[in-house]
Amino acid sequence: MLPLGPKKALLEYTLFSSELLERKVYVDAISDFLKNYPTGGYEVLEEEEGKIPMTCYRFDLKNSPTLLHIGTAGGWTKPSTGYTFQRINKKTKELVDFLKQNKPLHKFGKRDRFWFYDLLFIDVLAKDNGSGADLFRRMFEKNAPKTIFNFLDEKSSFQEEFQIMRSFNIKQFLRALLKRIF
């Protein structure tokens, strides 16, 4: 929930799922949340819905020497959060520099440690979808906002990343890592 004023807020419901669910499932989840929230009633002013591919799928493998998929179709959405705007800005700047080098387009982009962090995070959520709220809650409770946003914007230092990782139940992530390795 994001407050927009003293009596107005944006409520977003996010669900990690390999399948789309009926609209009623999402509406019921929001209604259940609001029933337990001490608001004294509410009025829905606007609704929207969307589907964001929160995945570590290798979109880059669909590129060719002369074709480069960009934006969400190019895998530029951050897998663990669904945020796209900041990453498109960053990737666009990188792409401009890359194009100046006259290299084949399929050589653009790379998987880095942040891709790997997202991969493990998505694996943890896929195994236990209900843990998402707790993971984010722990991260925000145990870290300074600047550290969190550096991490989410993929600008963090290893020290900040270690601090973020200490927020979580490390066993969940070790299991995900071991499953990837073996």
Predicted regions and their residues:
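Short hydrophobic/aromatic-rich motifs at helix boundaries and adjacent loops
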Residues: 1-5, 67-68, 104-109
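Conserved FAD-binding catalytic core of PHBH/FMO-like flavoproteins
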Residues: 1-26
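Secondary-structure boundary elements
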Residues: 5-7, 32-41, 100-103
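Short acidic (Asp/Glu) and glycine-rich catalytic loops that position anionic groups and cofactors
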Residues: 9, 69-73, 112-116
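FAD/FMN-dependent oxidoreductases across multiple families
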Residues: 17-94
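C-terminal helical "tail/cap" subdomain of flavin- and related membrane-associated enzymes
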Residues: 93-182
